[in-house]
Structure formats: structure tokens, C-alpha cells
């Protein structure tokens, strides 16, 4: 039987980052220190309204990237201008928690983001007011798991990092300590 090891980023958070954040914001209680709750990876496939086979490629890509089978998002109501019917698949999303979340975040920060051409850093203004951060990626090729020769088309995705931070400053400090490459104004 092999012993399971904690993800690298999770260990760093517990040993170094939590202590730094506690000093920085002078928390009384250890439970006040912000941490990660979940990461939601969403891939909208608007063209799936016209061609239903496109959703299969998105599901396959997301499964390969995250290691978890995505849930297919369906249209809530019909919209004639978009040629959209209620119940039609229009995207897929994955919610990552626990060790899978830490592993995915580590891979994204250390491998995927540096592979983006002309990458200048993530915008520090994309927080939602409650310490959660959302950023978009324009193509799925930046992940090593995706074989460039086998993709049927380029798909972007939204990645939302949900934290226990109460405001944007705490969330920004947490993500900066975790290694998010924010742009300096």
C-alpha cells in the first residue's frame, strides 16, 4: 500500500502561507485565516446550439484537464435570436474540491499560465467583492494534458477560485501568497 502525500501547494499553504496571512491581518483565531473552498472550471460552448457534437469535445477536454467528469449545462429558456431551445446543452462545468483542487491550481499556476504567449499577468481587479476571483483562459492548449494535434477546435474557459476571505484584500493577499501572477498597476 502506498502512502498518499498531500499536494505541494496545500502543504505550503498550511506550513507557510497561513502563518503569514495571520500576521498580515492580525487574526485572533486560526479559523479566520482565508483559505480555498473550491475551484469551478466552466466551458461555455455557444456553438453547441447549432451542432450538438461540439459539446462532446468540450466534455472530453475538461475531463482531460481536470481529471473529473464535467456536468453538462443546459439552456434554461428558449431564445429565438440565438436559435436556442430550452434544455439544449450549451456548456459544461467542473467543481473541484480537496486535493484535486490543490493539484489543479498548482498545475495551472506553474505549468499552464507560463505557456500563454505574451502573458503579462492576471488582472488584480477581477474579484467579486467577497474575496472570490475569476479569470478566463482563451484556449485549452496551454495545459500539458491536451494534445495539440487532437483538438477539434480552440475553446476558452472561465476559472473561478472560491475562498473563505471576507473581502477582496484578504482574497488578493491569499492568492498572491499562493503564487498568482497579478499585474502590478
Curated annotation (Swiss-Prot):
PROSITE patterns named among the record's database cross-references: RIBOSOMAL_L5
Pfam families: Ribosomal_L5, Ribosomal_L5_C
UniProt KW rRNA-binding keyword: yes
Function per UniProt: This is one of the proteins that bind and probably mediate the attachment of the 5S RNA into the large ribosomal subunit, where it forms part of the central protuberance. In the 70S ribosome it contacts protein S13 of the 30S subunit (bridge B1b), connecting the 2 subunits; this bridge is implicated in subunit movement. Contacts the P site tRNA; the 5S rRNA and some of its associated proteins might help stabilize positioning of ribosome-bound tRNAs.
GO annotation terms (biological process): translation
Gene from which this protein is expressed: rplE
Entry-linked SUPFAM superfamilies: RL5-like
Keywords: Ribonucleoprotein, Ribosomal protein, RNA-binding, rRNA-binding, tRNA-binding
The organism of origin for this protein: Streptomyces griseus subsp. griseus (strain JCM 4626 / CBS 651.72 / NBRC 13350 / KCC S-0626 / ISP 5235)
Family note: Belongs to the universal ribosomal protein uL5 family.
One MF annotation (Gene Ontology) recorded for this entry: rRNA binding
Lineage: superkingdom: Bacteria
Database matches in NCBIfam families: PRK00010.1
Protein name (record): Large ribosomal subunit protein uL5
Subunit structure: Part of the 50S ribosomal subunit; part of the 5S rRNA/L5/L18/L25 subcomplex. Contacts the 5S rRNA and the P site tRNA. Forms a bridge to the 30S subunit in the 70S ribosome.
GO CC terms of this entry: ribonucleoprotein complex; ribosome
